[in-house]
């Protein structure tokens, strides 16, 4: 059985403490994965039938279970902290206290208002104090929180806060550019607009030169 790691528990607890956790129920945590997939597929079957789709059709008959598996194992896998990435934190023995920036992190999420895709990129930076982290883990943490029904504002703050607590520093900054298909494909149908959110703390917030380096350094 996969257990929730210490780092995953730290992440979850700090988000709960700060009121930044997603609105996740606890009642269904004991449902096994396969049972959850089947239950979701049953409801999807009903939804598709109410849309007058013929579920006997060769192309559609397996769609409910395909969507269900996609929800549980892929696009909403970030709802389960057992899927939180394994984190490699190291003592900053080399005394590196300059800015570390990871650019163009691919994020694919889902709008929690319409259950339609949000996709874009994040740039994340930190200035180490006592701890440093494997670079790919920054990407994986960001992608973990993206794999939930989300709003971009919450996602931005979640990533920042979790990195702060794991890295034991306030010096973290993040900016996210995303395209919302709830804007592109419905409602206003604006295919050219995008949404930008940012969150800065520590030296990124208090020091103008560091802030400008984060936003403008290539």
Curated annotation (Swiss-Prot):
Q: Where does Zn(2+) bind?
A: 111, 114, 182
Q: Reaction(s) catalyzed by this protein?
A: GTP + H2O = 7,8-dihydroneopterin 3'-triphosphate + formate + H(+)
Gene3D superfamilies the record matches: 1.10.286.10, 3.30.1130.10
GO CC, any one term: cytoplasm
User: Could you tell me which pathway this protein works in?
Assistant: Cofactor biosynthesis; 7,8-dihydroneopterin triphosphate biosynthesis; 7,8-dihydroneopterin triphosphate from GTP: step 1/1
One GO MF term, please? Answer: GTP binding
Q: Do you know which Pfam families this protein is assigned to?
A: GTP_cyclohydroI
Instruction: State the superkingdom.
Output: Bacteria
Return the InterPro entries for the record. GTP-CH-I_C/QueF, GTP-CH-I_N, GTP_CycHdrlase_I, GTP_CycHdrlase_I_CS, GTP_CycHdrlase_I_dom
User: One biological process GO term for this chain?
Assistant: one-carbon metabolic process
What are the record keywords, sorted?
GTP-binding, Hydrolase, Metal-binding, Nucleotide-binding, One-carbon metabolism, Zinc
Top-level EC class, please?
A: hydrolase
**What's the EC number here?**
3.5.4.16
**Record note on quaternary structure:** Toroid-shaped homodecamer, composed of two pentamers of five dimers.
What HAMAP family is this protein classified in?
FolE
Q: Which NCBIfam families match?
A: folE, PRK09347.1-1, PRK09347.1-3
Q: Would you tell me the protein name for this molecule?
A: GTP cyclohydrolase 1
Q: By which gene is this protein encoded?
A: folE
């Amino acid at each position: 059985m996969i257990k929730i790691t210490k780092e995953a528990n730290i992440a979850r607890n700090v988000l709960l403490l700060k009121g930044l956790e997603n609105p996740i129920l606890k009642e269904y945590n004991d449902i096994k994965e396969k049972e959850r997939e089947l239950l979701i597929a049953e409801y999807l079957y009903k939804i598709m039938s109410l849309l007058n789709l013929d579920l006997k059709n060769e192309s559609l008959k397996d769609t409910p279970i395909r969507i269900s598996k996609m929800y549980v194992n892929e696009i909403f896998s970030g709802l389960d902290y057992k899927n939180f990435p394994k984190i490699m934190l190291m003592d900053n023995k080399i005394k590196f206290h300059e800015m570390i920036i990871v650019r163009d992190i691919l994020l694919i999420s889902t709008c929690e208002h319409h259950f339609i895709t949000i996709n874009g990129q994040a740039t994340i930076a930190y200035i180490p104090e006592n701890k440093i982290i494997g670079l790919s883990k920054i990407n994986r943490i960001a992608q973990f929180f993206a794999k939930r029904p989300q709003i971009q504002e919450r996602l931005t703050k979640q990533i920042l806060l979790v990195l702060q607590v794991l890295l034991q520093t306030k010096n973290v900054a993040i900016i996210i550019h995303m395209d919302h298909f709830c804007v592109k494909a419905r409602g206003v149908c604006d295919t050219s607009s995008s949404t930008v959110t940012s969150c800065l703390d520590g030296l990124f917030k208090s020091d103008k030169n560091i802030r400008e380096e984060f936003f403008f350094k290539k």
